[in-house]
């Protein structure tokens, strides 16, 4: 991970970390990064602290995209297959890491989390599943738990259109990147 400062200087802030699947700024400074585990990385000295180890989730092969809510909880998708290893997709999960460091599984049946974002009021979580070709929406409770998901947008079959990143604008509109450039 590289940092471009306001003066235009580039520096490497997360050296020698393979497989970064997602990252978010942490409220106390530094970054939260996903990949082989979920870790906090200091932007000052590069110190790393594991927040969620891969072996904490049975059958998980890694973590992909993640985001944080207003309270500082971390929402992340786990993988249950090697995405670039030629394996057939197997469902992973959507998890939340609470403020006390505990992890809860919120939703099952996720093939490839590739975008997470909250509505401006924090009451809805949007979740793109690249291999399923859809964006899910969840209602979010005050404790960070979510209700059952509903289909927010279907982009295709995960082959012809691949939702590969998601951002929610200040006006509440949801922007989804398509890895195949179909729209």
What is each of the regions a protein language model found here?
Residues 1-2, 37-39, 85, 92-95, ...:
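A short loop-to-beta-strand structural motif that recurs across blades of beta-propeller domains
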Residues 5, 42-44, 98, 139:
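Structural recognition of the beta-propeller blade-terminating site
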Residues 7-9, 46, 101-102, 133, ...:
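Short coil/turn linkers that define WD40 beta-propeller blade boundaries
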Residues 8-15, 49-56, 102-108, 148-156:
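A short beta-strand motif characteristic of beta-propeller blades
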Residues 16-35, 56-74, 80-81, 91-93, ...:
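Beta-rich, blade/repeat-based domains predominating
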Residues 40-53, 62-66:
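A generic, well-ordered mixed alpha/beta core segment in the N-terminal half of proteins
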Residues 138-145:
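Short loop/turn segments immediately following beta-strands, especially the blade-tip
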């Amino acid at each position: 991970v590289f940092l471009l400062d306001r003066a235009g200087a580039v520096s490497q802030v997360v050296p020698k970390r393979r497989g970064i699947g997602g990252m978010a700024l942490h409220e106390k400074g530094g970054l939260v990064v996903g990949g082989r585990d979920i870790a906090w990385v200091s932007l000052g000295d590069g110190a790393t602290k594991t927040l969620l180890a891969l072996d904490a989730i049975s059958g998980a092969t890694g973590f992909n995209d993640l985001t944080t809510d207003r309270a500082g909880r971390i929402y992340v998708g786990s993988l249950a297959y090697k995405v670039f290893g030629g394996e057939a997709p197997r469902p992973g999960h959507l998890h939340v890491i609470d403020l006390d460091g505990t992890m809860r599984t919120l939703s099952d049946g996720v093939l490839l989390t590739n975008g997470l974002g909250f509505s401006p009021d924090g009451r809805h979580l949007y979740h793109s599943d690249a291999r399923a070709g859809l964006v899910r929406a969840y209602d979010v409770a005050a404790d960070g738990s979510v209700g059952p998901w509903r289909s927010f947008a279907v982009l295709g079959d995960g082959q012809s259109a691949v939702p590969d990143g998601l951002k929610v604008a200040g006006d509440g509109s949801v922007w989804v990147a398509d890895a195949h450039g179909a729209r």
